[in-house]
């Protein structure tokens, strides 16, 4: 009898694990239909997944020192250790940051892409590099529950996208080294600026002797080796510029075999959650992306946001599947609003939490209980009756602290914030 009960328990556990794995493959776009039937109406599990990965992308914005008066402008305010706890992530122990990622660029970019210290700020931490995000891995408990070890790459976006969007050139260049010609497509081309941020390096900067691309690929390789006996997944996420970098990073990993490990040569599935993403590449890039196995991308687009369509469709093509949301349907947000609110990541996540479909008659209901105050972290979007100040996410006293002699000095970062 005891043996029968033990076998029954083990069988039930196995079936639960199998069902969980199959469900994850579906919500991560890994099935043959790539989210077909899950977007309108939005599947409950997928809704939570988008918010979770969106929050991991939001952490990069929350940690960025953006004030040019600081010698550390363009760096992270916090060290990797307990990083997600310091940015007040909703589940700070679910992932552990294993590496920071830094980028530079060999071409001129809009100033908003990479905030830098002003000349008057004094000795700058770097004159060339910017902190561009991090790599993290799921904690043991999360991995055990999910039946897989999730590796996340979170790419930083820009706070002033409306400014850079109008100053963005439309130059396409071959995506050499990222993705090449294949069956059904010729050499893909991508936006020059996005590619430059992803692939540029500078031997004069200690942070970019390796490009952002090389840093991420090396860390993914290391983590896949460290967890070689576990089922793994790779999820890339980002907002705005970060979403464009996520798109490049995702296809790069698969096209060049960085998701294949060990003698089994079994590929690890790669999923990108790209929020408010501008278009990245041409029609050949689209063909390559949409034809590549073990690669899925979900673009989340807010209907009034101008950034996803700022690069002309005659030259640049959308890739992956699209989830369309509309912040104008939320009864909690000010209406009319403006481009800054429409593009803001917290506003996007609010829309994901409440969207009831893309049709004309679809309503809005916060089926995910997400704090309304988050909407006003960086913008003034929440209706006044909720009594939440605009742009409230600021460092106490703007990073000014009183030293032992009683004088106020700038101390806007913690020790170890420049870790690699």
From Swiss-Prot:
It is an enzyme of class 3 (hydrolase). GO terms for molecular function: phospholipase A1 activity. Keywords: Coiled coil, Glycoprotein, Hydrolase, Lipid degradation, Lipid metabolism, Secreted, Signal. Disulfide bonds: none annotated. Its EC number is 3.1.1.-. Its main location: secreted. The keyword Magnesium does not apply. The active site is at 240 (acyl-ester intermediate), 240 (charge relay system), 305 (charge relay system), 343 (charge relay system). GO terms for biological process: lipid catabolic process. It is found in: Secreted. The keyword Transcription does not apply. One of its GO terms (cellular component) is extracellular region. PROSITE patterns: LIPASE_SER. Residues 367-388 form a coiled coil. Residues 1-21 form the signal peptide. InterPro entries: AB_hydrolase_fold (IPR029058), Fungal_lipase-type (IPR002921), PLA (IPR033556). Glycans are attached at residues 231, 294, 403. Belongs to the AB hydrolase superfamily. Lipase family. Acylhydrolase that catalyzes the hydrolysis of phospholipids at the sn-1 position. This is Phospholipase A1-II 3. The lineage of its organism: Eukaryota, Viridiplantae, Streptophyta, Embryophyta, Tracheophyta.
């Amino acid at each position: 009898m005891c043996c029968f009960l033990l076998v029954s328990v083990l069988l039930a556990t196995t079936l639960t694990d199998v069902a969980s794995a199959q469900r994850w493959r579906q919500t991560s776009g890994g099935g043959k239909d790539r989210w077909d039937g899950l977007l309108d109406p939005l599947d409950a599990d997928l809704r939570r997944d988008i918010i979770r990965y969106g929050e991991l992308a939001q952490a990069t914005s929350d940690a960025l020192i953006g004030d040019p008066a600081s010698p550390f402008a363009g760096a992270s305010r916090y060290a990797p250790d307990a990083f997600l706890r310091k940015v007040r992530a909703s589940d700070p122990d679910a992932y552990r940051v294993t590496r920071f990622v830094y980028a530079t660029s060999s071409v001129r970019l809009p100033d908003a892409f990479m905030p830098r210290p002003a000349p008057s700020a004094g000795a700058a931490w770097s004159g060339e590099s910017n902190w561009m995000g991090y790599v993290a891995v799921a904690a043991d408990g999360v991995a055990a529950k999910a039946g897989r070890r999730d590796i996340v790459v979170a790419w930083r976006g820009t706070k002033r996208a409306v400014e850079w969007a109008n100053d963005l050139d439309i130059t396409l260049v071959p995506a050499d080294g990222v993705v090449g010609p294949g069956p059904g497509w010729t050499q893909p081309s991508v936006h020059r600026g996005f590619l430059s941020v992803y692939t540029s390096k500078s031997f004069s900067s200690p942070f970019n002797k390796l490009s952002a691309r090389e840093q991420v690929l090396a860390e993914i390789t290391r983590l896949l080796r460290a967890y070689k006996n576990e089922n793994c997944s790779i999820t890339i996420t980002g907002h705005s510029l970060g979403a464009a970098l996520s798109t490049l990073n995702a296809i790069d990993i698969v096209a060049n075999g960085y998701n294949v490990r060990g003698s089994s040569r079994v590929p690890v599935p790669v999923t990108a959650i790209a929020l408010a993403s501008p278009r990245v590449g041409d029609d050949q890039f689209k063909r390559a992306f949409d034809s590549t196995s073990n690669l899925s991308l979900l673009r989340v687009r807010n209907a009034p946001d101008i950034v996803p369509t700022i690069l002309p469709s005659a030259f640049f093509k959308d890739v992956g599947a699209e989830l369309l949301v509309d912040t104008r349907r939320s009864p909690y947000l000010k209406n009319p609003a403006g481009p800054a609110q429409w593009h803001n990541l917290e506003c996007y996540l609010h829309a994901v939490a409440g969207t009831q479909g893309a049709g004309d008659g679809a309503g809005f209901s916060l089926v995910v209980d997400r704090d309304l105050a988050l909407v006003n972290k960086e913008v003034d979007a929440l209706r006044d009756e909720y009594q939440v100040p605009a742009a409230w996410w600021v460092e106490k006293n703007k990073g000014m602290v009183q030293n032992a002699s009683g004088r106020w000095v700038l101390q806007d970062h913690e020790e170890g914030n420049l870790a690699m």
